[in-house]
Amino acid sequence: MSSSRRSRSRRAGSSVPSSSSSSRTSISEDQIAELLSKLQALLPESQARNGAHRGSAARVLQETCSYIRSLHQEVDNLSETLAQLLASPDVTSDQAAVIRSLLM
C-alpha cells in the first residue's frame, strides 16, 4: 500500500480495509505494530535485543515461522525419544505408567 493511500486512510479515521472480505474486521497500523511487538517479544532471539531496534514486519514474521518450525522439530525429537524410552526393556511398567500419566 502506498504511503499516500495510508495517509488518506488515517485522515478519514478508518483502518486499512481487508481486501479478501469486507465482513472481516479491519485492523489499524497501530494495532499491527502492537501485535508485531508482542510477537517479537515471544521470540527467544528477541530477548537478547529487547529494546534494541525493532525489526521489520517481514523480519518478525520470518523469525516467528522459523521459531515455530524449530519447536515442531523439537516436539518430534522429544516424541521419538519418549517412544524409544517407553519401548526400552529397562523401563518398568510402573515407570511407564508414571510417564504416560504425565502426558495425559
UniProtKB/Swiss-Prot annotation:
Induction: By epibrassinolide. Residues 1-11 have a biased composition (Basic residues). It comes from the Eukaryota. Residues 12-27 have a biased composition (Low complexity). The keyword Cell cycle does not apply. GO terms for biological process: regulation of DNA-templated transcription; regulation of growth; response to brassinosteroid; unidimensional cell growth. GO terms for molecular function: protein dimerization activity. Residues 16-71 form the bHLH domain. Expressed in leaf blades, leaf sheaths, lamina joint, stems and panicles. Expressed at low levels in roots. Residues 1-27 are annotated as: Disordered. Keywords: Growth regulation, Transcription, Transcription regulation. Belongs to the bHLH protein family. Gain-of-function mutants ili1-D (T-DNA tagging) show increased lamina joint inclination and hypersensitivity to brassinosteroid. Atypical and probable non DNA-binding bHLH transcription factor that acts as a positive regulator of cell elongation and plant development. Binds the transcription repressor IBH1 and forms a heterodimer of antagonistic bHLH transcription factors that function downstream of BZR1 to mediate brassinosteroid regulation of cell elongation and lamina inclination. Interacts with IBH1. This is Transcription factor ILI1. The gene is BHLH154.
